[in-house]
Structure formats: structure tokens, C-alpha cells
Amino acid sequence: MYTLLPSQVKPHLAYLKKSFGGSPSLADIKSGLLVALMALPLSLGIAKASGFPPALGIISAIVGGLFTGIAGGSAITIKGPAAGLITIVSAALLAFDQSLGTVAAVLTTTAVLQFLLGRLKLGALGSVFPNSVVHGMLASIGLIIIAKQIPVLLGVDPKLYAGKNPIPMFLDIPWYFQEANPTIATIGLISLVLLFLLSNVRGKLFKTIPPALIVIAATIGLSVFLHLNTQGPSFALVKIGDWTSLLELKPDFSKAGTFLFWKFVLLFLFVSSLESLLTVKAFDFMKTGAAKANSNKDLEAQGIGNFILGLVGGLPIISEVVRTTANVGFGGKTAWANFFHGLFLLIFLVFLIPLIECIPNAALAALLIFAGFRLTSPKQYFQTYQVGKEQLALFIATIVVTLATDLLMGVLAGMILKLILHSFKGVKPAQFFQTQVKEDPNNGHCLLVLGPCIFSTILLYQREFNRAKAKGIQSLDFRQCPFVDHSFMSFLQQYQVESELELKGLTDLKPFSDHPLAARRLIKKNL
């Protein structure tokens, strides 16, 4: 019999402590438990909405918790399946004739590319996409989620809306109410109202117990009281069954030579990586007490998790914003919180299946509609308008094209429109990927920025600024810069914090709105 000696175990424990940010604390264990309780229904709902067996949603979150922390990256982000990927995953499943194996092959390929992006330190590529286009993409995902979950919320027979696109589904909402199952619709609408009410209630109780958990507990009670398992329709409740058989699924690469396969690889890679990088960036700006994240390491961790999930047919995982927000609120400080969130989910899946199968699908739909609303709330539209009318135009254009076609076309349309608008502002096509800087002849510690600063030049200028800083430059002067767009202003806000370089001259340029990060241009004065 082979046994591990203490001397053999010690190096492994030391490696885990280093990877996870020290020994596990009681705060991390507590946060892991509370996040797991919140992640359980979300993971079930995301899997079901994506067209996957619900158990695979939990399995994906388990992998996101147990295996990604080893690679490092972000100390406080929680990895798991996300509502923002429902649209792509369900579209892939539909495109490949419901073949989970082909989608698994797409995910496995995506994971390898994700890991390579992190290893090659290309995590900063997420900066090249215009802010308003990214927000438009997320808002369109929110609208698609809402459209596809309304009939589930109302208890409409899935056969009546299977395969429909979001715009027809929005137009069919009055008909869905006519076809609603009164009992299921009541549960769904009560769940939705409770989520909106409880999310706006302030108090100690709601910092400890997530509103989603209260809703699920209440609807489990309702489903038992109303005997939905025996008297409700077959689609009323979550079905788990023998989840261990799902792990036998293998990736099917037979479509790897097709354009469709690589289109979805690109979509999976783009949206999942971008959402993760946005989450990591957002929480780096918050004073959480956690160590600063390494976005490249986080991509590597995501790639490792997604590779494992591709091999077993799971859903893609990202650094998920809702769970991460909860983790910060619950006091999680290290990657152990993510690990314990995965461990507790594993315990739930093994021991609590009878209870999980009492959860109404309408309650899960309510959770997803609430998540979708947060992505596309009126506040998002108003905040975009405040930055500038041209930003709202980009935002709306991305949404419209996405709803009419798909996410890839929506983002491409938004970026093309952005470049067209920049052309009207005087930016020449030759300057779309060009930098123009020189040292100030009157001040050897200052770098003059002389060319347009737009989203497509962010990485190029970042390289120039880093080189200049290494040579002793202490400030960047934008007084002669002809144009700075909103995405570049957002980049400068973050870059100034990281580099501690002084920014000069931005207030001398004329902004397009009163927003501090509004696009601005040089107004030449007549002498």
C-alpha cells in the first residue's frame, strides 16, 4: 500500500497556500458557503436556459471553484457559468443540432486559446474594444435573456417557443400570457417581484442571506404545498436525475473543419474572456483588501477550468460579476473563498438532489430575468447618454444589430460605426492604428502626445507610455492632441492610477459632454 509521507505532503500544501493567498480563514469559508447557496440556483438556471442538463451548471461551478485557483490571477473573483454566455451557448447548441459533444469541442478549443492568451500576456487585448460597444453587447445579452425566459416564467409549454429568435419572442409576449399556466405563472411572478423588492432592501439580514436564496426557499415551499411534482406539468420543476452519467460525455471534433465551429470558438473566446477581464478590472478599482489581480493569470486559470469542462461536456466559466460582488460583500479575501464555494456545491450535488428537484423552473427564470434586467437596465442607457450622444448611438446600434443577427455581428457593427464617427471627427484611416509622440524639448521629463487617441490605439500608446516612463518621463501632455475618445479616456483613468504619471492638457480640450470621461477634441484658436 502506497502512503504519502508528511515530507511529501508539505511541499504540496505550501504550493496551495501560495496559490490561494495563504491559509484558509473562517471569513473565506463563510463566504464560500453563502456564495455557493446563491450560485446553486443561478447555475441550474443558466444551464437550463443554455439547453444543457441542469446538473452540468452545478458541475461547471464546482470546477470553477476547485480547480482555477491553483493558477492564480484574481484573489476574490468567483468562477462559474454566467448569464452573459447563455445566448452564445444556446445558439451553438442549436447550430450543431443539439450536439453537446460538438459544443464541448468548441469549449475545449476555446480553453486552449484562452490559456495561450494569458501565457503570452495578451490579457490587455480586452482594452481595444470601445466601451459603449461592450456595454451594448452586454445590454443585448440582457434583452435576449429576458425574451427567452418570459415564457418559462409564465409556465408556457417549451414546445411552443423552442428555437425562436429574441425579436419574435418579444412580440409574442401578449400571447405567452394567454398560454400561461396559472399556477406556474403565479410562482414565477411572485419570485420576480420578491427579487426586485428584496434587492432594494437595506439591512444586516440581506447582507447575510442573498435575496435569490430567500426566493428559492420560498418557491420550494410553494412547489411542495401545491404538489407540483405530481399535479404540475412535466416541465414545472428542475430535473437532475443520474448526473454521474453526464460526465461520460466526450468532445466531438468532427465539425472542427467548418466555419461554424470556428465562429463559435471566436464568440466563446471573445465574450467569456472580455467579461472576465471586465470583472477583474472592476474589482481591482474597489478597495476590497484583496491582492491586486493579474489579468493574464486569470485568463490562464479560466483556460484551465474551461479545458476540464470541455472534456466532461460542461458549460464555459468566467470570473462572474454577481457571485464576485456577493463574495466581496460576504467578506471573502483570498482564492480560498472560490475553492470553498466549489466544495460546498459538490456537497449539495451529492447530498441534496431531492431538495434541488423541488425548485420550480419559473423561479430560476425569475433569477435570470432579474440578472438580464441588471445588464440592460434603464440606468445603463442613461449613463451612456450622459457620456455623449455618439456613445448612445454606438450602444443602441450594437444592441439592434445583435438582436437582429448575433453577438459577433453586433460587436463588429458597433466597432465599424465607431471608426466612421471618428472619421467625421477628423481622424484619418491611416491614424486608426498609429501613435504620434515626442519628448517635450522644453521639459525632458514630459512626453507630448500629438496624434489621435482612440480605442484602436490604446495598446500602442500604452507601450509608448511604458517605454517613456522607463526612460524617466514623469508626465504626459495632451494639449496638442487632436482627439481623445471615451474609451481612451477610460483607459487613461486606470493607467494614471497604475503608472502614477501626471496627465496634462486634457482639460484644455473641448469635451462632447459634461461627463468627466467624455470624448474631447482640440479646438484651434484663430490668431
Language model features with spans:
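Core transmembrane helix bundle of multi-pass membrane transport proteins
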Residues: 1-32, 89-90, 94-290, 345, ...
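Membrane-embedded helical hairpins/re-entrant loop segments and their flanking transmembrane helices
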Residues: 16-21, 25-34, 38-75, 254-336
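Hydrophobic/small/kink-forming positions within alpha-helical transmembrane segments
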Residues: 36, 66, 84, 115-116, ...
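Alpha-helical transmembrane segments and their helix-entry boundary regions
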Residues: 57-58, 76, 84, 103, ...
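Hydrophobic residues within alpha-helical transmembrane segments
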Residues: 63, 81-82, 108-112, 190, ...
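Membrane-helix interface "capping/anchor" motifs
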Residues: 70-80, 200-207, 329-335, 378-386
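The feature marks cytosolic C-terminal regulatory regions of anion transporters and related permeases
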Residues: 374-527
